[in-house]
């Protein structure tokens, strides 16, 4: 696999490559600030997506999203929940621009970080090389990359693996790198699809401390979660049901 460096979200789900709103393929310019409540950093409206399954006489349509919509405001942590197959990951991919919707609009204000459910990393690159590669794609200079990388190694507790190739990493350490790539540019909006799969308890706790810090800094986080214990960390919960995003 050849690394692709450049603007935009990159291949579908590649470890957190988001970008600012000018880079996200499905993003439109964010709403203009006016008097009243703060503008949302993310607004999705009327998102529909249907997959085609089977071949020949068995070919059929499988509607997944049926006019789904949601929004996030600055300084919010929102949980996205729902049964398996309810469309959570599909919606996340559409929000970040890694998957085209059949209809609907997505408005994003600011830089986006994306952590896909399954880490898609380059087996022959080290953690340091991943962070350097993605930092260039984010438009960061070397000093900014090094400073951010050091903080992420410390906050997620995987600095001893920085010079190790991904092929030699455990699943939990790959998950840490996957999350670090999304956090690298200090995005205004962080989209996380079950980001802590494979984390031990200590790292799981570190994750929520880090997330609380982002809320305090006015950043927004959308987290796909299956854990009941996560609910205490969310400001709001949105449930995917019947192809729509419904406030719980």
Regions inferred by a protein language model and the residue ranges of each:
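Conserved ABC ATPase "signature" region
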Residues: 132, 136, 143-161
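The feature captures the beta-strand-to-loop junction immediately N-terminal to the Walker
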Residues: 81-83
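Conserved ABC ATPase signature
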Residues: 165-172
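Helix-to-loop junction immediately C-terminal to a conserved catalytic motif
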Residues: 96
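Catalytic Walker B motif of ABC-type/P-loop ATPase nucleotide-binding domains
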Residues: 190-194
């Amino acid at each position: 696999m050849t690394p692709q460096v450049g603007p935009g979200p990159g291949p579908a789900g590649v470890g957190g490559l988001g970008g600012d709103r000018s880079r996200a393929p499905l993003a439109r310019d964010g709403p203009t600030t006016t008097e009243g409540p703060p503008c949302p950093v993310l607004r999705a409206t009327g998102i529909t997506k249907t997959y085609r399954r089977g071949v020949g006489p068995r070919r059929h349509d499988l509607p997944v999203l049926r006019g789904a919509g949601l929004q996030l405001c600055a300084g919010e942590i929102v949980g996205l929940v729902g049964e398996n197959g309810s469309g959570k990951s599909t919606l996340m991919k559409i929000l970040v621009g890694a998957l085209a919707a059949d209809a609907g609009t997505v408005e994003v204000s600011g830089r986006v970080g994306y952590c896909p459910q399954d880490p898609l990393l380059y087996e022959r690159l080290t953690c340091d090389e991943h962070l350097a590669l993605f930092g260039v794609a984010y438009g960061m200079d070397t000093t900014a990359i090094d400073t951010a990388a050091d903080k992420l190694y410390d906050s997620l507790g995987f600095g001893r693996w920085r010079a190790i190739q991904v092929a030699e990493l455990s699943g939990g350490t790959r998950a840490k790198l996957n999350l670090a790539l999304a956090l690298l540019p200090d995005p205004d909006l962080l989209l996380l699809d079950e980001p802590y799969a494979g984390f031990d308890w200590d790292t799981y706790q570190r994750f929520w401390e880090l997330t609380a810090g982002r809320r305090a800094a006015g950043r927004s986080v959308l987290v796909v979660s299956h854990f009941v214990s996560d609910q205490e960390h969310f400001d709001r919960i949105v449930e995917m049901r019947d192809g729509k995003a419904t406030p719980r």
